[in-house]
Amino acid sequence: MSLFSLLFALFSCQAQDKGFESLPVEAFKRAIADTTVVRLDVRTAEEFAEGHIEKAINIDVLKSDFEQEATSILPKDMVIAVNCRSGKRSKKAAGILVKNGYKVIELDSGYNGWVKEGN
């Protein structure tokens, strides 16, 4: 088995263990085109105001009441598509949401990657 194959297999297992899928920009874009997907931006209000994915809800994952606010607003019968600036905070938020019974996808490269690819 090549090193690349081994790393790919390890990464795939880790993603499954987290309970959510991290998607590249194009796959995320296709996923959020579905009207049954809720778009969640977990950056600060200031970052969100500078630009965001259309129709996204903003709940700052760094706020102490993120979990309470998210679970009171987000529907559990829909997929939650999470993004942040670069992918770190969205992974944290995705983990919290999965723990609370949500089905989650996450934009691996964040809003920066989204913009970089011309969106």
Q: Can you name each region flagged by the protein language model?
A:
Residues 39-41:
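Structural scaffold elements adjacent to functional motifs in cytosolic proteins
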Residues 4-7, 11-31, 37, 46-79, ...:
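Rhodanese-like catalytic fold shared by cysteine-dependent sulfurtransferases
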Residues 83:
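Short, surface-exposed ligand- or partner-binding patches at beta-edge/loop junctions that are enriched
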